[in-house]
Structures are given as structure tokens and as C-alpha cells.
Amino acid sequence: MKRILDCGPADFRQMDGAVLLEAVRRSEGRTVLCEVLWPAPPLVDGVSNAEVVVAFGADLVLLNMFDGEDLAGLKDHLGRPVGVNVEPSEDVPAHRRASRENLRRVADADFVVVTANPDAEVGVEEMLSAVALVRETLPGAPVFAGKMHGSGGRGMVGEGEISRLAEASDAVLIAAPGTVPGSREPLVAALVDAAHASGALVVATVGTSQEGADAETVRELALAAKRAGADVLHLGDAGVSGITDPMNVLAASIAIRGRRHAYRRMAM
């Protein structure tokens, strides 16, 4: 079985959810997930934002606020696994909800992320219910769960909550060290250990607009996430025009896996 580091478009097209998760696990913290704000105008004319982050080194692409139709066509065009955010809240538009109807609309997604944008106040119980609904509606699809930031609150979630999310999902989202207030590296490492102990992967998230900071800051965040034990580095959609600054994608990619793997990913 290949590591995600070594996979190209032909490999991704043949993967099921279990193989994708194992490919990430085998890559030892060297997977880059880039989030794209779907409604945002493209940073560069003539190409989509998703194409830009893929060109600069994204292994996985995550669509936020996706209201499009041809998800299968987008996946084929990008040559990368594509996931979609859903939110367990009735206060967000229908195309963002973790509802059965919306999940069926995004059934072609390679993975589903149960999370919350800043305008949606969502707790762990709501997330657990949503994870169960995803499992029921889209059997076999990997499910990620957790918050990329405070979502209107403050501070980090506790080990107990992380363990519960990890037991229910395939990967848990945990704010990377240095992002949300209080996200000290030893604390994040303990949360990562709790998630791993329950069998889940960990996605360390940079979703506090720091994905649009200078490259050195992003490199520091990326390395802190890797030191804490994260399997995947997430770079959010609030850098520039609905994506991470492309040069920051490259900087983070080189930091966590070196030029060899970074350049290979860009070329595949």
C-alpha cells in the first residue's frame, strides 16, 4: 500500500475511504490539507482556487460552504481527494448543514468534515450526532470531526471530548499549537495522544486567518503541529481570496516533508 506522499491522480481515483486513511497514516505527519472557501472569487483569473492550492502542494482539498453540483467532475479535474465541510446547525444555509438531504448531495466527496464556521455555535454532542448521520447516510466515507478554531468560543476542548470524537470518527480536528488562545504545544500534544489512543488520525488546523500570515510564521505553526504528533496539517481558507496564501502552502509543505516530497506533489 502506498503512502499519500507517493500517490498520484490515478492512485487517488482508485482509492476507497479505508485506503485513503491508511495512506495518510503511513505518511507520518507529512500530509497537507488545504481548505477552499467555495463562494470566494478566484485569486488568479482563469483558474479556480482549488487548482491553485493543488499546484502549490495540497494532498487533500476541503471545500467550505460548497453549493456546487458537479463534485465528481471537480475531483477528476483536480486529481486529488476532495472533502466537504458540513455543520450540525439549523442556523446555517441548507447547503452547509449536516442533514441527510445535503449529505446525499455531496455523496461523491472522498471525506466529510463535521465542523463549525464562526457563525455556527456547535458543541460536541451535535457533532457526535452529525458523525452518526454521516456514517448512516454515506457508509464507507471517512468522517473527520472537530473545530478548526473557537467557532465563537474561546480556548481548547478537553481530552474527554477529543476522545469521544475520536471514538466516533476517523480523524479529529485539533487547533494547531499557536493558533487559538491557550493552544500550547504540550497541551495539543496531549490531545493528539488522546485521539490516537482512541484510534483516530489527527488533523492539526490553522484556521484562524494565520494561514495568511508571513511564511516564517506558517512554517513555525506547521512544525509545531508535527512535533505535537498530528497526521495532517490543515491550512484554512482565510488567507487571501478564500484560500491560504499559495506561497504559504509551499512553505508549510517544504517544512514538514522537505523539498523532495513537496516538489513531487506539485508535479503529480
Positions of PLM-derived features:
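Active-site beta->alpha loop and helix N-cap motifs at the rims of alpha/beta catalytic domains
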Residues: 2-12, 36-159, 164-185
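Catalytic-face loop-and-helix region of soluble metabolic enzyme cores
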Residues: 171, 175-244, 255
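Surface-exposed amphipathic alpha-helices with a cationic face
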Residues: 17-28, 54, 71-78, 127-144, ...
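C-terminal helical cap(s) of enzyme catalytic domains, especially alpha/beta-barrels
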Residues: 71, 238-265
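N-terminal basic, low-complexity leaders that serve as flexible interaction/assembly modules and, when applicable
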Residues: 1-34
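Surface-exposed amphipathic alpha-helical tracts and adjacent flexible/coil segments at the periphery
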Residues: 2-8, 261-268
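Short, glycine/charged-enriched secondary-structure capping and boundary segments
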Residues: 49, 127-129, 187-188, 217-219, ...
